A protein has these predicted regions:
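A translation/RNA-centric and nucleic-acid-associated enzymatic feature enriched
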Residues: 108, 178-334
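A generic secondary-structure signal for well-formed alpha-helical elements
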Residues: 33-40, 148-159, 308
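Class II aminoacyl-tRNA synthetase-like tRNA-binding/catalytic domains
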Residues: 2-118, 126-130
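N-terminal pre-domains immediately preceding structured catalytic cores
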Residues: 42, 49-55, 168-177, 319
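Extended, charged alpha-beta segments that form solvent-exposed binding/catalytic grooves
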Residues: 103-189, 193
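Generic recognition of stable, solvent-exposed alpha-helical segments in well-folded globular domains
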Residues: 20, 24, 28, 136-143, ...
């Protein structure tokens, strides 16, 4: 059982008020995010076919939930994320540079190891916008991170105004740190402990350079080779004082161009993926240059509503021993 039990935990909101607050948080953040990044909400699939190449392979080992479709005889997969679908959708909808889309993404990750912040059910805002080739820079990435972080701070202010017994925790600014800098600072620490040290010091961190090899030969964390450019991506991490952890609330980046895709497919030894429809279209220059990411809805609610477990803000499945332990600890799972 992977479970942190905060000492003398007492939720700041009861079950019914929590449900009301979840709706308030999601509506406010979504509206502010769309305004900040110039995004239009669109509908999105919950399933794709394996041969489309559109599903997110995550770290490359997670198994998608799949099933056969009676009418067509096809196999369908529940999405892991919409990272690649969004880029294709931007072209389909005719978006222009500076414009983008977002959607409510619901996924099932059957191989997830659950704990206070991990669930087999994933709900996030998936967003993507078109950029120009000249905007494929760290400066563009950092400016977008700051806009998202400002939206998060506005949302925290909104929550605190509605529920005065919830006090603000977020620092005024987010700090940018590279995964290589963390390795240099803490070469003997496990990767997640490095993240913890950074957020414990700064409160809010954007950790860059996820997926590629560090000087030690290790990756800080896995990323599929065919959506983020590993040199232009990162995670938004917050210090959660209730759980005393580094809480990842967003993963985002500037997406691969043809050169980056070829390079990263070769590094991972999966050049055959270049023949899949999405990857082939990208290599042929048929898809726009984009940046995008996912922002965890339930994780944001865990943080802003001062919850101890993601199961307090979403309905999912949990092992019986976790259910029993949560009940004893006054953690009310939905």
């Amino acid at each position: 059982m992977h479970l942190i039990i905060p000492k003398n935990y007492n939720p700041v909101l009861n079950l019914r008020d929590t449900e009301i607050a979840i709706k308030l948080v999601k509506d406010f953040f979504e509206t502010e995010l769309a305004r900040a990044l110039n995004l239009t909400r669109v509908s999105a699939p919950i399933m794709v076919t394996p041969d489309s190449g559109l599903n997110d392979n995550l770290n490359g080992i997670e198994r998608p939930v799949s099933f056969d479709v009676l009418e067509t005889g096809e196999t369908a997969e529940i999405v892991h994320s919409l990272a690649k679908w969004k880029r294709q959708a931007l072209k389909t909808y005719g978006f222009q540079p500076g414009e983008g889309l977002y959607t409510d993404m619901n996924a099932i990750r059957r191989d997830e190891t659950t704990d206070n912040i991990h669930s087999i059910f994933v709900d996030q805002w998936d967003w993507e916008k078109i950029i120009t080739p000249k905007q494929r820079t760290m400066e563009t990435l950092q400016a977008t991170v700051r806009a998202i972080y400002l939206t998060l701070r506005k949302t925290e202010g909104f929550v605190c105004a509605h529920y005065p017994h919830i006090k603000p925790e977020l620092p005024d600014d987010i700090t940018f740190v590279s995964s290589q800098e963390l390795e240099d600072l803490y070469p003997d620490l496990p990767l997640k402990e490095r993240e913890y040290r950074a957020v414990r010091e700064y409160g809010a961190v954007f950790l860059t350079g996820i997926g590629g090899a560090l000087r030690s030969g290790q990756m800080h964390d896995g990323r599929a080779p065919d959506y983020d450019d590993w040199s232009l991506n990162g995670d938004i991490l917050l210090y959660d004082p209730l759980l005393d952890i580094a809480l990842e609330v967003s993963s985002m980046g500037i997406r691969v161009d043809p050169d980056a895709l070829r390079r990263q497919l070769a590094i991972r030894g999966c050049e055959e993926r270049a023949e899949l429809p999405f990857q082939k279209a990208l290599l042929n220059g048929e898809l726009p240059q984009t940046m995008g990411g996912g922002i965890g809805q339930s994780r944001m609610c865990v943080y802003l509503l001062r919850k101890a477990h993601v199961g307090e803000v979403q309905a999912s499945l949990w092992p019986q021993d976790v259910q029993d332990a949560c009940r004893k600890a006054n953690i009310q799972l939905l």
